[in-house]
Regions:
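Short, Lys/Arg-enriched N-terminal segments with co-localized hydrophobic residues
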Residues: 1-6
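Eukaryotic intrinsically disordered and solvent-exposed regulatory patches
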Residues: 10-12
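Local sequence-structure signature of Cys/Sec-based thiol-disulfide redox active-site neighborhoods
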Residues: 15-52
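Acidic beta-strand-to-loop metal/phosphate-binding motif
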Residues: 26, 79-83
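Thiol-based oxidoreductase modules, predominantly thioredoxin-like and allied folds used
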Residues: 50-66, 75
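A short, glycine- and basic residue-enriched loop/turn
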Residues: 74-77, 90
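Non-catalytic, surface beta->alpha helical segment in thiol-disulfide oxidoreductase systems
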Residues: 82-112
Length: 114
């Protein structure tokens, strides 16, 4: 019973993170020190968009690392979420960055505050 409860608490935490951060990256490590090549490439693509983004280091949050793939229906990390929607992982993000779609998406999600 206890384990099931903690599982639903983790799912609630994931939902809250996704809902409260317009642009959110679940990654291994942090943007300054990514702990895998896929996370590093995704961070680079996001940084090139020139907007701030939130991140969750799944290596320091093993319970999120365990639950998020099932919640997202996406098995791998990193995962980029924009406005509550899963955009995808490294391959998708890199491709979107190359064709300009990523910047368009991020700019639309985070309009300049001036």
């Amino acid at each position: 019973v206890n384990e099931r409860n903690s599982m639903s608490e983790v799912v609630a935490q994931i939902k809250e993170q996704i809902e409260s951060n317009t642009v959110l990256l679940y990654m291994k490590g942090n943007p300054n020190q990514p702990q895998c090549g896929f996370s590093a490439r995704t961070v680079t693509a996001l940084m090139e968009c020139g907007k701030r983004f939130a991140y969750v280091d799944i290596l320091t949050n093993p319970e999120i690392r365990a639950q998020l793939p099932a919640y997202a229906n996406w098995p791998t990390f990193p995962q980029l979420w924009v406005k509550g929607e899963l955009v995808g992982g490294c391959d998708i993000i890199t491709e979107m960055a190359e064709n300009g779609e990523l910047k368009t998406l991020i700019d639309a999600a985070l309009p300049d505050e001036d």
